[in-house]
């Protein structure tokens, strides 16, 4: 009996990968590395503390992944500065797929938001996000990367991810080695997303705290009436509370991109949206649910 234990997985910038490659092989670790696309911007934005470029070393380390027994993949976060070089991004995806051990079907895009970029990078508008999404489909639909562009590349914006929860505090947790528990990598070190410490607090208190904090974070802004009228609310749940509060907004920052993806992937609009809105408000909102009957 007991729990099934999975193999370890690490997220890494791949800079010091060569130091750990034997351990990675020994313990069958799967790897998710981060790269900037287009690659020439990696050297601009990902430098060492001593201002040294890192791309050449990272591409060498990608080659070391060839012989690891478990999965390896990379992801790229796209800001406006990357979006402005969309054709270069396409070229570099093809380059990585053809010339490295990476299968670029197993790759994912994230859409950057300004919170963590120290003012260096800027977020794309919703129109630019949709243009980016459509350009990737135009280029890769029907190609040897069709599986990727219609699957993992944009999966983060589908309902399989964390934002599909009514309350993500009921399901997702980030544990630090000192025992501190936060919501996730976005909420890490932010007191509004701190749930407690496993050495000092009971499990019950941590779970209650998690649920309550996410509820409060969703309610910092009033419920968006566009969301109330949207038949995809059952999939989106108004988006990530952390990002909404970072932007001072009350709807998902990738709203239009999500709607494109829902249509392309055949998700049905909810014909009983009014009933869903009532149940959602009852569970997740401070607004009077009676107004939504």
Residue ranges and their predicted role:
Residues 35-39, 113, 234:
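Short, small-residue-rich loop/turn micro-motifs
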Residues 1-39:
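Conserved SAM/AdoMet-binding glycine-rich loop
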Residues 40-168, 174-178, 190-195:
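Radical SAM enzyme [4Fe-4S]-AdoMet core and its adjacent flexible, acidic
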Residues 6, 154, 210:
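Short, basic, glycine/proline-bearing loop/turn elements
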Residues 184-185:
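Short linear motifs in exposed loops
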Residues 188-293:
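Flexible mid-to-C-terminal extensions adjoining Fe-S/redox cofactors in radical SAM and related proteins
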């Amino acid at each position: 009996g007991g729990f099934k234990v999975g193999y370890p997985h690490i997220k890494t910038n791949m800079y010091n990968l060569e130091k750990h490659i034997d351990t990675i092989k020994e313990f069958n670790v799967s790897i998710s590395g981060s790269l900037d696309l287009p690659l020439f911007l990696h050297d601009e934005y990902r430098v060492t503390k001593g201002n040294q470029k890192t791309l050449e070393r990272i591409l060498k380390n990608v080659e070391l992944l060839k012989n690891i027994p478990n999965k390896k993949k990379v992801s790229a976060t796209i800001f406006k500065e990357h979006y402005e070089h969309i054709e270069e991004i396409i070229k570099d995806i093809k380059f990585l797929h053809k010339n490295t051990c990476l299968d670029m079907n197993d790759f994912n895009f994230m859409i950057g938001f300004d919170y963590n970029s120290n003012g260096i990078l800027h977020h794309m508008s919703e129109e630019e996000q949709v243009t980016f999404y459509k350009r990737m489909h135009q280029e890769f639909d029907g190609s040897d990367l069709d599986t990727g562009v219609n699957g993992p590349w944009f999966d983060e914006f589908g309902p399989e991810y964390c934002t599909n929860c009514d309350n993500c505090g009921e399901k997702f947790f980030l544990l630090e080695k000192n025992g501190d528990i936060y919501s996730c990598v976005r909420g890490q070190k932010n007191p509004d997303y701190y749930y407690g410490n496993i050495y000092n607090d009971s499990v019950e208190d941590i779970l209650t705290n998690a649920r309550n904090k996410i509820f409060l974070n969703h309610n910092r802004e009033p419920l968006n009436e566009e969301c109330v009228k949207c038949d995809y609310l059952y999939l989106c749940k108004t988006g990530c509370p952390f990002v909404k509060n970072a932007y001072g907004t009350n709807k998902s920052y990738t709203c239009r991109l999500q709607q494109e993806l829902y249509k392309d992937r055949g998700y049905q609009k909810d014909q009983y949206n009014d009933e869903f809105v009532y149940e959602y408000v009852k569970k997740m909102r401070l607004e009077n649910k009676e107004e939504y009957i």
